[in-house]
């Protein structure tokens, strides 16, 4: 797994550390928990036929969690990620097992141990049939090369992969994959495949390319968009106003975009692109992300006056990528220059003024 280090997150699901970005792919409190809390639980799914655009598919947690939670729907997933390897490894990643021994050992790794927070263990799950569906569609897209046995068989990584699914693919290999499209022949291997999937249409389309190029080629609209790119300072390419405007054009009038970030830049970018924007609040009443839609009714937790004011400071100035082809460095430098030349109030000054207003209000109330 060149460039990636697997580790156990706080809910005992597997996350990845990127050596390129020196950052984690998944929240330290739980990769699977994050997928459910930020990309599944905020959505009220009423339609029976659904189209999902998953930007930065990675290990597939968001789409897998959504499918697992919506078993009786017909769903088409369009999955975008520049890294084909992660796509192909996605069905084999462990999500349902406690790996406490490995959690204790990884504390010695200073690259990612600081991110991991052992929190409340929640029984979110990904059932095996979801991964079997992924295996089927990955094979149909990439052929036999989707099965990266050189990585899956390495001893150092074996604790992070589902051995039963690896063995399942090896069995299919021996049969020349001739049974991979025949659910009735899989019945003796996995009853749940027949039970859940024989009467439904589930489709995964994979686009292993720069998401900026892919979104310009898509000619359909979506009910849900998952925006799960690296943070803005690491991957500004997928947070620019120009990219977000493309997403606005790809989403249905009643569609919903969800993302993990609470960033002032991104919330203002979404608003400038035409979205109504609100907050995602988890069951612990913590703000864990941002929700956006063309339909104001879809927003349950609006931004308050203070948060809206903060968007109008220098902190809210968007990233710009006019051709959707610039490097991260170019985009960051362009925004830096725009911020320096802007006459808008700085966020630090705005926060200070707001704090002083609160202090004055409290003082007046005491009189």
Where are the regions that the model predicts?
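A short helix->loop->beta-strand "cap" motif at the edges of active sites that frequently abuts
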Residues: 73-75, 250-255
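A short SAM/SAH-binding and catalytic strip from SAM-dependent methyltransferases
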Residues: 223-238
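The AdoMet/dcAdoMet-binding core of the Class I SAM-like
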Residues: 45-219, 226, 241, 283, ...
């Amino acid at each position: 797994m060149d460039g990636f280090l697997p580790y156990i997150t706080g809910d005992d699901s597997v996350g990845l550390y990127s050596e390129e970005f020196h950052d984690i792919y998944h929240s330290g409190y739980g990769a699977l928990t994050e997928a459910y809390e930020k990309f599944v639980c905020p959505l009220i799914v009423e339609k029976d036929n659904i189209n999902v655009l998953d930007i930065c598919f990675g290990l597939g947690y968001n789409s897998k969690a959504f499918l697992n939670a919506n078993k009786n729907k017909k769903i088409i997933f369009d999955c975008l990620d520049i890294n084909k390897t992660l796509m192909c490894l996605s069905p084999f990643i462990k999500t349902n097992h406690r790996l406490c021994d490995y959690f204790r050992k990884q504390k010695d790794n200073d690259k990612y141990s600081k991110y991991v927070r052992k929190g409340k263990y929640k029984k979110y799950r990904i059932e095996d049939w979801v991964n079997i569906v992924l295996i089927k569609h990955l094979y149909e897209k990439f052929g036999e090369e989707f099965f990266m046995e050189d990585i899956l068989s390495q001893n150092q990584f074996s604790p992070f992969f589902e051995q039963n699914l690896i063995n399942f693919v090896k069995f299919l290999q021996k049969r020349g994959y001739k049974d991979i499209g025949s659910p009735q022949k899989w019945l003796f291997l996995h009853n749940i495949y027949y039970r859940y999937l024989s009467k439904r249409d589930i489709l995964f389309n994979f686009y292993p390319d720069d998401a900026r190029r892919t979104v310009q080629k898509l000619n359909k609209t979506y009910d849900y968009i998952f925006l799960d790119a690296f943070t803005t300072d690491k991957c500004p390419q997928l947070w620019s106003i120009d990219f977000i405007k493309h997403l606005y054009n790809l989403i249905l009038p009643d569609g919903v975009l969800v993302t993990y970030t609470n960033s002032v830049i991104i919330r203002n970018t979404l608003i400038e692109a035409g979205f109504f924007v609100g907050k995602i609040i988890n069951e612990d009443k913590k703000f864990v992300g941002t929700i956006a839609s063309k339909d104001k009714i879809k927003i349950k937790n609006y931004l308050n006056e203070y948060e809206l004011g903060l968007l109008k400071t220098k902190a809210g100035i968007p990233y710009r990528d006019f051709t959707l082809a610039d490097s991260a460095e170019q985009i960051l430098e362009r925004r830096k220059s725009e911020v320096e030349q802007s006459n808008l109030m700085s966020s630090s000054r705005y926060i200070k003024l707001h704090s002083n207003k609160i202090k004055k209000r409290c003082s007046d109330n005491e009189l």
